[in-house]
């Protein structure tokens, strides 16, 4: 298909799905995760990757969207998802056996046109069939990278046509022998880095404590890549155990930053009210 961009083809505003974090929506520059695009969320273990995705799923469902969760890690917790506001009974869940099966399911869901958001958790768990059927200790160099490269070539066109948001969760690995620069890299080769319109680096920066009891994590998200707005912005928010992103805490922090709320010591005041 070929078209001339002379105005006859109506240019529409970019549709987005909120992340559930006000600060992160602002950092993304467009108000959320862009539809019709691929998004990669990566970070260390227990940094809040799945929580952030489930928060976005809950926001999508709130606006009448249909969501699917491809759980390659076989670790989906419906009780926790429900606490974050996910309507579990309306969520399509798949727990595939192989990487090929997971990506085929993802492609089928996208091509159907009936799904608004697909989450793949995680790229590291997309094990090629040859590796599953082989013996422990067998060498399968580059198999997963080749699988991801082929799948993304197929997926990217369908994602644009159906205006579906596809989020890939990814893990971090260390490169051996790196003297300069960061030794960290993500799994599954380089293809996902190229095909992603947005890449988010999520890190746990500290703990939220009440006395000795740990109530949650302080979290920082950096927008490492952004094709729809300026990149390298960042957002900080709290993730409370069993509750998810602390919306009230984030609202107060943004209010203080923009001089809407006054802070003096441990007190916050707005229009004279403390």
From Swiss-Prot:
Chief place of localization: cytoplasm
Pfam families xref list: RecA, RecA_C
One GO term describing the cellular component: cytosol
Sites where the protein binds ATP: 43-50
Keyword Cytoplasm: yes
SUPFAM superfamilies in the cross-refs: P-loop containing nucleoside triphosphate hydrolases, RecA protein, C-terminal domain
Subcellular compartments: Cytoplasm
PROSITE patterns: RECA_1 (PS00321), RECA_2 (PS50162), RECA_3 (PS50163)
Record family assignment: Belongs to the RecA family.
Protein name: Protein RecA
